[in-house]
Amino acid sequence: MSQETKMLPSLSSLLSGTEISSSPVSPSFTNPRTSFHLDDRGTIKLPPLNTSINRPRSVESALRHTVTSLHENSSAYGDDMLKHTQSDSALSSQLNSSQETVDESHENLLLTPLNSKKRDYSVSSKKNDILTPLSAAKSIIIPSASKEKRRAFAFITHSQETFPKKEPKIDNAPLARRKRRRTSSQELSILQAEFEKCPAPSKEKRIELAESCHMTEKAVQIWFQNKRQAVKRQRIATSKSTTIIQTVSPPSPPLDVHATPLASRVKADILRDGSSCSRSSSSSPLENTPPRPHHSLNRRSSTPSIKRSQALTFHLNPQKKTLTPVKTSPNSRVNKLINSIDHSPSKAKRPVSNPSGSPKRKRKFGFKIVDQQPLKDLDPNAFRG
């Protein structure tokens, strides 16, 4: 086989454009041969950027565009190819084949216009679905017509503008409050007079009051409810205050036994009995015991109030109708012995003559009272007799 040497064209031939290129040209590659102009100095000047220089495009990229863009691109593409490849026959034949392929693709696209529309719609929908911070804020603040029924937040409050019409979409507006209606003095007097008659009027009566007071029936009902609650609270407060005053009462003064009229009478009787006893003791020669002073009786009567173990009791004299204080002992037997003594004047104590001269008193039970002397040594033989 004879080896053929392939030579590249010279630079001058490429610049002049007279040499026919022997290299195969792909149908999708455009090779616009622009003639470069040389200056007087021999420098090459590039063409201005305003001239339309199309980039090489493949058949697949051409199929992705719309029909109109493909038509415009194909016409411009064909014109440029015809301008620069008039002398090249091989290139012109390949250009025809490329135009045929473009026409076939053009016909295929014309036959299936729905697919392109679907693609365009999907692309546009994808673009619209992309959310930016600004678009998200706009969608929340200004909801679209299709999302009017949706609520922006779970908690919805009324605003001043949307309260009479519909629910608001957001709650950043100031809260709407109904204006409070103040009753006049004339209306208040009518309602209070009716409340004094009947605290809970019927519905017919409430309607009459609403017409006379220029109010609604519901407003009259609410006024009566509030009035009943206020009266109930006031009644409870007054009852509590009265109970507190009753519980916190001033303490009663202590009972003075000596200040009572009965005690003063008893005291006078005791003094009188004491004086009579002193006279009888001074007249009798056998009893040498001096009478007890009056202050001892007072001290004796006052001591039971101090000591808890002793109690002050009185003995009633049926003839003179006087009370005599009797000192009680915690021993019940001693109390019986003391209270059993008869203090009546008919049975007065008679002094018994004692030959030895020592004053001895004989009691009911035969107890012997020995003279009160300081303790001495006890003689056990003295008790045998």
UniProtKB/Swiss-Prot annotation:
Residues 176-235 bind DNA. Residues 10-23, 87-99, 275-284 have a biased composition (Low complexity). PROSITE patterns: HOMEOBOX_1, HOMEOBOX_2. Induction: Transcriptionally activated by SWI4-SWI6 heterodimer. Residues 24-34, 236-249, 299-312, 319-343 have a biased composition (Polar residues). One of its GO terms (biological process) is cell differentiation. Interacts with MCM1. PANTHER family: HOMEOBOX DOMAIN-CONTAINING PROTEIN (PTHR24324:SF9), HOMEOBOX PROTEIN HHEX (PTHR24324). Present with 861 molecules/cell in log phase SD medium. This is Homeobox protein YOX1. It comes from Saccharomyces cerevisiae (strain ATCC 204508 / S288c). The lineage of its organism: Eukaryota, Fungi, Dikarya, Ascomycota, Saccharomycotina. The gene is YOX1.
